Amino acid sequence: MNPNFLDFEQPIADLQAKIEELRLVGNDNSLNIGDEIARLQDKSSTLTEDIFGKLTSWQIARLARHPRRPYTLDYIQHIFTEFDELHGDRHFSDDAAIVGGIARLDDQPVMVIGHQKGREVREKVRRNFGMPRPEGYRKACRLMEMAERFKMPILTFIDTPGAYPGIDAEERNQSEAIAWNLRVMSRLKTPIIATVIGEGGSGGALAIGVCDQLNMLQYSTYAVISPEGCASILWKTAEKAPDAAEAMGITADRLKGLGIVDKVIAEPLGGAHRDPAAAAATIRGELASQLAMLKKLDNEALLARRYERLMSYGL
């Protein structure tokens, strides 16, 4: 099984393997097999459209965790210029599961903050698999307060299974760090745009997710608990995760219908990992447009709008 494809994508993987095989044969024998390759590519595109046109919530949850999916630093590289990463919470240490710093979106200085997972084993461990400890959230808070001080908009990228639940994180008051961020972000006198690019896991996501505009990529998720966790609680087995994913309403379209998400950002055919540059270009356009809209509001109107947004959640 090709590790770059999930199990429900295997028919696509098989076609891609045939295309690569034909290309190798053509290179070795100087044969003109362009027509056959083009036919298979068209067939692959049609098959991809068919499969991705009827994804279940569980399949979308798995896409959100795809190992090749672009992470925050990938999007920073494509979307922004002059990124200068800042480190440390000025209390305990630096947390590599949260990255942040000053950058430019076109000519506009912005503060960019996001969760960061790892690709290889060592980086996964260093980034703690994208699960921040309290110092990560306190670093994010420090950068957000700096952004307010220098009148820079804040752009956050959410992609985490959740806040780290380890003993050391609890000893340093994980819940307080998250709660403090919610308080601070609700009062910041600068525009905040949050974009869920992969997993939006519980309070670990919400701690950098209080905003004026919430975006979700088409194949991202946002939930109070993972489908496996929910299934383990309700059905006493993680095998019911597909049922839990459907019942929880974790997908972008479902959350848009509930009024929680403002914008669902379309991904390239097959997901953002198939064409990261195209995905980044789409996000960049949305961020620029939304930022231009929010900058028209004065601080009083911005905070009133944010307060109304927060108070509208729930029944």
UniProtKB/Swiss-Prot annotation:
One Gene Ontology CC term in the entry: acetyl-CoA carboxylase complex
Species the sequence originates in: Pseudomonas fluorescens (strain SBW25)
Upper classification of the organism: Bacteria, Pseudomonadati, Pseudomonadota, Gammaproteobacteria, Pseudomonadales
PROSITE patterns for this protein: COA_CT_CTER
Domain CoA carboxyltransferase C-terminal: 39-293
Alphabetically ordered keywords of this record: ATP-binding, Cytoplasm, Fatty acid biosynthesis, Fatty acid metabolism, Lipid biosynthesis, Lipid metabolism, Nucleotide-binding, Transferase
Subunit structure: Acetyl-CoA carboxylase is a heterohexamer composed of biotin carboxyl carrier protein (AccB), biotin carboxylase (AccC) and two subunits each of ACCase subunit alpha (AccA) and ACCase subunit beta (AccD).
Protein name (Swiss-Prot/TrEMBL): Acetyl-coenzyme A carboxylase carboxyl transferase subunit alpha
MF terms (GO), sorted A to Z: acetyl-CoA carboxylase activity; ATP binding; carboxyl- or carbamoyltransferase activity
Cited NCBIfam families: accA, AccA_sub, PRK05724.1
Family: Belongs to the AccA family.
Subcellular location as annotated: Cytoplasm
